[in-house]
Amino acid sequence: MSLPTLIILYGPDGVGKSTQIDILAKQLTADGHTVKKVWLRGPHTMAFLLSRILIKAGRTRHLSNPFGRVKTLPDIGTNPLIKQLWALTEFVSVLPLLVIRVILPLKLGYHVLADRYVLDVVVSTAFYINDPNFIRHKISNILMGFIPTSSVLIHLDADYDTLIKRRGNLVEPESFIDFQKNGYALLSQRVPTHYIDTSKLTVDETSEAIQGILRNCKG
């Protein structure tokens, strides 16, 4: 089996995704592979503009991390139709990005390394509309369909204390991290994933764990 053409790293901020994507890109390039790095999360374009409008209008909710740093989010409210509209807006916004940044490069023979992908879009959207059930929504199912069966998905994780040490006052609020982790756990039941807890691993040890997964996938 050849090297997977789409390699996806996902997980909370602070687990080392970007660092590992950079290391992997250098390794694959040195081995003669043509590589493209991508990043997807949300909100995108129209959904982002809508969030700015709601925040400007004072429709907000606030979360804070242990350092008192406040994360301001649009308050979508509880109206199911508005939640559906937000989710649909995000879907329409991210669709062309998926085609341009991922699908076309794959068709052109690139190895695409995704620092976040549709799993993160689904979880992010669910969080913005404050609805964990969105993870089972038909829009989520369509987004998950953009994961080719030959892809390798690697969930990088770390406990919250480790994230605090790594991110300092930039660490995301714990409630947001908990929401992400619960969402990832649900999505991992739908697609084959590999899990690495980076809490007690060095950068090199995490890289070697990723390389081991890819070696096994190549057969």
Q: What is the role of each PLM region?
A:
Residues 9:
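Hydrophobic anchor at the beta1->P-loop junction of P-loop NTPases
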Residues 17:
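Conserved lysine of the Walker
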Residues 12:
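P-loop (Walker A) phosphate-binding loop of NTP-binding proteins
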Residues 31-47:
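Short beta-strand-centered segment that lines the nucleotide-binding/catalytic pocket of NTP-utilizing
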Residues 111, 116-186:
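A glycine- and Lys/Arg-enriched "phosphate-lid" helix/loop adjacent to the NTP-binding pocket
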Residues 20:
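Hydrophobic positions on the alpha1 helix immediately C-terminal to the Walker A/P-loop
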Residues 161-219:
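NTP-dependent small-molecule kinase module
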Residues 42-130, 134:
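ATP-dependent small-molecule kinase phosphotransfer cores
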